[in-house]
Amino acid sequence: MSHTFYNSLDLTCKSPFGAVKAGQPVTFNLTVPEDLGYVDPHLVLTKDREDPVHYRMEFTGQTPKVNHFALTVTPTTSGLYFYHFDLYTDFRRIYRTPGGEGVLSWTDGQDWQLAVYEPDFKTPDWLKNGTMYQIFPDRFCEGKPNKAMPFADRIYRADKTGEPYFWPTEQSEGYLNMDYYGGDFAGIQQKLPYLRDLCVTCIYLNPIFEAHANHRYNTADYLKADPLLGTNEEFSALCAAAAKEGIRIILDGVFSHTGSDSRYFNREGRYGPGGAYRDRSSPYRSWYDFDSGYPCGYRSWWGFETLPEVQEESPSYVEFICGKGGVIDTWLNLGASGFRLDVADELPDDFIEKIRAAVKSHGEDKLLLGEVWEDATTKEAFGRRRTYLRGHGLDAVMNYPFRSATLDYLHGADVTAVADALMLICEHYPAPALNCAMNFLSTHDTERAITAIAGEPCNGHDRYWQSKRCIPSGLMDAAIRRLLLGYAMIFTLPGVPCVYYGDEIAMQGYRDPFNRAFFDWNSTEQRLRGPIKTLAALRRSCDAFDGGRLEIVRAEGDILHYRRVGVVQTAEIILNRGPHLIAEEAFGKNTEVNPGGFTVLVEDNHPEHVGYFSVY
């Protein structure tokens, strides 16, 4: 194989960069070495699961030792397309290699991807240069202390620094998630000044609906706030108070399953004689799939019998979630600014589209975010390619691929592979979705950031092992410095950074429930908050971080150097994970970067520019 001159990341080869709107012309420029002789290159463009279409490229000229060819194609419908080049005359083709570069091959290789999205796809502008903050409601702040438990099977935890219960560890039914620390709406409202000071502009709340586990992913009543958190009216007051601080709130929408202990299913009988499990004539019966072929007699989420799956195509369920006076309508009317859809890739595309319509009926500024762990443009689930990131479904997704790339960089992985992983998502995602993607280092579903970065690898160890591990105090300085590198990445890459509550004070913890401890309000750890505030403020003031194009300048050894190019300003970000001071050229000048540190430089895009920088 030999290399040829095409790179999808280079605007002189493909313009515009990345995904395009339906009806938007795309120009391809191919440069072929003269020593290949006569060639007749064609672009081979294939819409997903359709037959390929061959487009002959036009010879546009010759420079020493190379021939130039060009073609402009206008995809008219949204969808997922793949392409490569065929030289025809010698039966060789040009396929993608890491970094977007083309390579000549006699055999089949990897196509480039071209995502085409709806021309009217828009996402909320208010989110794009802001900062998100995720709160697990029971574990953030107790505004009304020493609560009486609203249900007898709940355990109140007055010992706020105590470890979450995780027993029984090895029993098949697992632990019950019934210990509650008392976090509530009043506590969140009390801490709004703290969040404002951290430059937070959006709070993402894990589930708040009534449910009978501390995580509240087993919904019992979609239309009622869990009484331990407060009332619907108190939630509305929280949203109003947050708005005065310039902060919006989005909610977790868990619409693929309910709890078995709910007014809809009611297996446990808490809600009287009704419910789909106990009453065949229940209005909720059609929501569920009852069949003796299932181990528990009904379809459940990943086999957990306490989480019966709903049939999202059930008309009455769709109306309940999306209709007037339904779940979405109720909570947006109370002041929420949108939803994050739990397990979005397990929801039918047409159901997501109906949710989108319900959300956007309250204004185009309302947000619909989805939980997707992979590249959302190529995701397949249940035998079907998902279409939710083409402009008629989700606004954006949680950016797990960026998290993986960031952790890989911090753990010493090949930096060129890290750069390719970052650019691949930028190339694949529609710009409106990319600019609202949720960038994070940890969530309630992962190890805490500092544990993932500097802790002993979990490697499948049980909860007892996890409960006995923490980062030694002598290693914390290095761990925090490395964590800052991670924050530098998620705050300066395309998308919206999100801080998981407590990560800013270096709270540790492996998987659930250790990553869900109560916020330590007595912590004296302050080394992360200042840099996070600086990065968040920089995002607000520099237009390069509001949709600016990502370009990799250098990815070599321990150095990852990239720039964001905005309309008015350009930012250069240099990260150095290595143990030595480096000097890297940026904006025509040598810039020193500390060992394990980073530098951000910003200049205006005109001759009389004013530059500034921050160093850690």
Annotated model-derived regions:
Residues 1-136, 142, 148-149, 173, ...:
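Carbohydrate-interacting/catalytic domains
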Residues 30, 135, 195, 205, ...:
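Conserved, mostly hydrophobic/aromatic
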Residues 131-133, 203-205, 249-251, 339, ...:
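Hydrophobic faces of well-ordered beta-strands that scaffold small-molecule active sites
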Residues 136-201, 208-334, 355-361:
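Substrate-binding/active-site clefts of carbohydrate-active enzymes
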Residues 138, 382-383, 387-389, 395, ...:
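Aromatic/acidic polysaccharide-binding cleft in carbohydrate-active enzymes
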Residues 138-141, 209-210, 255-256, 337, ...:
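Short, solvent-exposed loop/turn segments at secondary-structure junctions
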Residues 236-248, 256-257, 262-273, 327, ...:
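Active-site-proximal helices and loops of the catalytic beta/alpha 8
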Residues 419, 423-425, 459-481, 541:
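Aromatic-anchored helix/helix-loop segment that forms the rim or "lid"
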